Amino acid sequence: MNVVQGNIESKNAKVAIVVSRFNSFVVESLLEGAVDTLKRFGQVADDNITVVRVPGAVELPLAARRVAASGKFDGIIALGAVIRGGTPHFDFVAGECNKGLAQIALEFDLPVSFGVLTTDTIEQAIERSGTKAGNKGGEAALGLLEMVNVLQELEQQL
């Protein structure tokens, strides 16, 4: 039986992190978690990490698409926080962001890791950005590192 799986060390990986500025009090912690994970676990060099800032979660897919189209990166991490309010706006923003990022991964055959929090409350967002529920930015980075390596393994074996 042949099993293809990736590890998380990826010293030469070039990673773009597309970050929403909206809800920055949460998103900055996600960014710190992602960068720390890339460096400590993935051994990714500072020079191989590019941060792209956009206004909000709706803008993440367009910026991520431009990054993917450049052909200069092995993967993209999208970070943001969409917190439910009193209107259906939350559903539209969260859904379109998720759909757009998934399309980019398939269109460009490139790992795009979804580190966009979609929570009902500010407290839930804070918990997922480095307190009780861990740091979802760091988790998104781990997933990205593994997928970069899985795709490289598949390329070599297929």
UniProtKB/Swiss-Prot annotation:
Pathway: Cofactor biosynthesis; riboflavin biosynthesis; riboflavin from 2-hydroxy-3-oxobutyl phosphate and 5-amino-6-(D-ribitylamino)uracil: step 1/2. Its EC number is 2.5.1.78. Gene3D superfamilies: Lumazine/riboflavin synthase. Pfam families: DMRL_synthase. SUPFAM superfamilies: Lumazine synthase. It catalyses: (2S)-2-hydroxy-3-oxobutyl phosphate + 5-amino-6-(D-ribitylamino)uracil = 6,7-dimethyl-8-(1-D-ribityl)lumazine + phosphate + 2 H2O + H(+). One of its GO terms (biological process) is riboflavin biosynthetic process. Keywords: Riboflavin biosynthesis, Transferase. GO terms for molecular function: 6,7-dimethyl-8-ribityllumazine synthase activity. GO terms for cellular component: cytosol; riboflavin synthase complex. InterPro entries: LS, LS/RS, LS/RS_sf. Signal peptide: none annotated. 5-amino-6-(D-ribitylamino)uracil binds at F22, A57, V58, E59, A81, V82, I83, F114. (2S)-2-hydroxy-3-oxobutyl phosphate binds at G86, T87, R128. The active site is at H89. Catalyzes the formation of 6,7-dimethyl-8-ribityllumazine by condensation of 5-amino-6-(D-ribitylamino)uracil with 3,4-dihydroxy-2-butanone 4-phosphate. This is the penultimate step in the biosynthesis of riboflavin. Belongs to the DMRL synthase family. Forms an icosahedral capsid composed of 60 subunits, arranged as a dodecamer of pentamers. This is 6,7-dimethyl-8-ribityllumazine synthase. It comes from Shewanella loihica (strain ATCC BAA-1088 / PV-4). The gene is ribH.
